[in-house]
Amino acid sequence: MGVELYKHNKVAYEKVEKMFEKENRVAVVHPTGSGKSFISLKWLYDNRDKKCLFLAPTLAIRDQLIRHIKSSGLELSDFKNLEFAIYPNFASITDEFLEQHHYDCVVLDEFHRCGATEWSKGINKLLNHNPNIKVLGVSATPIRYLDDNRNMAEELFHGNIASEISLAEAMAKGILPVPTYIQGIYSFQEDLDKFQARIDRLTDEDAKSRFQDLLNQAKKRLENADGLEEIFKKHITDPSGKYIVFCKDTAHMRLMMEETKKWFKDIN
């Protein structure tokens, strides 16, 4: 019994173990969906005789690890020395608490979040109180692009990256599926009205007639084109899947929350 890893994560884990022989802080940078959480889980399982701490940005990620424990045929009782915490709560951790709680190993899930002003306070206290602690960090995006492009793999792990796989590399190797891009126009009436208004303002009758014919042809093609409902029916094969709709701003998002109900009504 134990934690099974995919081939690419087995290779990464071997590199993690090798690097820990010389370093106290090791990072893994793999894309979302590649199973890097199982690398963390295996490391915690292999060090279950030590005092371990799993830190994550949200309760959802903590709960995900617990689900991984159970899906691996294990129980929380197999991790008697493991504690869980989330960065927001850990930010206010006291020196007194850390003096009474010694940790040998810590996992920093989505470690780029540790660069946040408040959340970093608790992490810094933890590392200062435990200078010899072993730290495993996992992230898909170690660069904080909106924070002066800080590289948290450099700041927290001194560049000790045991394994790094880019999203493009993961797709090329078959670790992640290659997305299929389907294009469709769902909102064109406003543009058609603008073109019609321009045509109506033309004074050259020949040009006016020519552009009107082109616009009429475009309208006919759009009328015969599949709507989003049909496109979704054709290309979404998993009705129970999770889907995300990107919007340009909050106002657009509120508008689209109602609009997308029509898109998905025949799917789920």
Spans of features found by a protein language model:
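Inter-Walker segment of RecA-like/P-loop motor cores
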Residues: 59-102
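Interdomain helical connector at the RecA1-RecA2 junction of SF1/SF2 helicase-like NTPases
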Residues: 147-241
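Walker A/P-loop
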Residues: 22-43, 246
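Conserved pre-motif I regulatory segment
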Residues: 1-29
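SF2 helicase catalytic motif II
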Residues: 98-144
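Conserved RecA-like ASCE P-loop NTPase motor core of nucleic-acid helicases/translocases
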Residues: 51-58, 242-249
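Conserved helicase motor "Helicase C" RecA-like lobe of SF1/SF2 P-loop NTPases
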Residues: 248-268
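Pre-Walker A (Motif I) flank of P-loop NTPase domains
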Residues: 21-27, 50, 239-242
